[in-house]
Amino acid sequence: MREVGFAPSMRAYFQVLPHSFYNRDPREVGTDLLGKILLRRQGRKVLTGRIVEVEAYLGADDPAAHASIGRTLRNAVLFGPPGHAYVYFIYGNHFCLNVSCLPDGVPGGILFRAVQPIKGTDEMFKLRGIPEGSDLRRLTSGPGRLAAAFGITRERDNGKDLTDPRSDLYIADDGKPPPRVVVTQRSGIMKAVEMPLRYIVAGNRFVSGKKLSVARPGASR
């Protein structure tokens, strides 16, 4: 892993995840992304959040995946090298952040559904357009809220290399022990809803949606 390009005082705490981290089955990547840090440079400010909920999309054999229809101009990032941002616009009102997985030419990805805000919450509230001091749990829970709070758009971020420490958006490891993981069905889709491809940090209050009623605990690591 490479050091993130922040101030010297932060370099000891964050190491950017390399391409090899994402060059794997999305199910493995999804589990291992939990507990990692999403980082955004927003002007002179730094926004960070701990990843607490993601979903895996398996590519051509996954009916719910954008890649299942084959390569298009819109989803081309999913067919490219691993570790790149795939951003799409949905429901006419919000963006969603994904990261490509698997080797170049083989589609697969992870959707980021929720993070636990750590640093820069004042700027996140501004980007969301809601009053500072509003319910912090709802600030970044859900893919649309997360993207808005981190200033993520398709024009700005689609195709961005999330392993580049010179970038203004990347994912890093701060050395914290891996969390306990819960695996359940994906949310907000119409196809392949039974597939257990949603990964959640057990007991975290920043996870999106209602309290889980059907889930199986992942192995404590």
Predicted regions and their residues:
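Conserved, well-structured core segments that form or line functional sites
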Residues: 6-221
